[in-house]
Amino acid sequence: MENAVKRIGVLTSGGDAPGMNAAIRSVVRSALSRGIEVVGIRRGWQGLINGDFMQMDSSSVSRIINRGGTILYTARSEEFRTKEGQEKAANTCKLLGLDGIVAIGGDGTFRGAQDLSKWGISVVGIPGTIDNDIVCTDYTIGFDTAANTAVECIDRLRDTMQSHERCSVVEVMGRRAGYLALYVGLAVGATAVLVPETEYDFEAHVAEKIRQARLMGKTNYMIVVAEGCVSAMKVGDQIREKLGLDPRVTILGHIQRGGSPTAKDRVIATRMGYEAVRVLAEGGTNRVIVTRSDQIVDMDIDEGLAMMKTLNQEEFQVMKIMTGQ
């Protein structure tokens, strides 16, 4: 079966995440070790539609394992959501002689992989998003780096907030999921952590926590907010109006996506890239590479996207204890 796969493509789609380059590097070198050619598709699914590609060899991916972002660029494609766009992408695969595609990205990327596989193209997905919100995997490439970046920024903010005895409200990314906020909040010892999985209640989740901290003798407070829960600006305004404090609001934004990936992200990305090539070489399609209890395995994309993911309840319980909930 392996000899049937002669040429594959690799692309990154959706939001970038630290470690994507490590995954690209692994895909290229793993494929070459099997005698499989690799084509890099630039700018995600739109690049596949447009035939925007580059031939890749081992030197193409030299010295990129430590780089953030993605050397293949990334983009979102409205055209690929249409049947006409998907047909164009499938035709490009055939014109380029591709026997399969490795797609690196989030849940939107995986839905694109689902769609493309219906046109007879073998596709394997690798989860890459700082949100860690893909239902079928314990871990997504980029999460550890983003969390460490957020922690470093908040630690720096806390230094100045302590000096001025102020309250700080920090908004982190995560879209509709609170994994990043929860993890970061635990790491920085936040006064309160607001996540979209819990309905926002200012009095219970913020005001009471600040009052408790005051009783403990604290004079500065750190509120970590997931972007999908409530606006950090709104929280800041409520603190000012109802508690009489003068909070400083910081939205970390896209800085969380950048920077050199951590060792964890580099290693997991490398292992996932290797596994994706193995699955394609053995005839797999419509598959996604996932982590389960520190093991790298593959599963059906349809089954993976149908799963429901909730916050880590153990971490959530620890957070509640740490913040006095």
Question: For each of these PLM feature ranges, what is it?
Answer:
Residues 1-2, 48-101, 108-109, 141-148, ...:
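Glycine-rich oxoanion-binding loops at beta->alpha junctions
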Residues 22-27, 108-121, 181:
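Short Gly/Thr/Asp-enriched flexible loops that form oxyanion-binding sites at enzyme active sites
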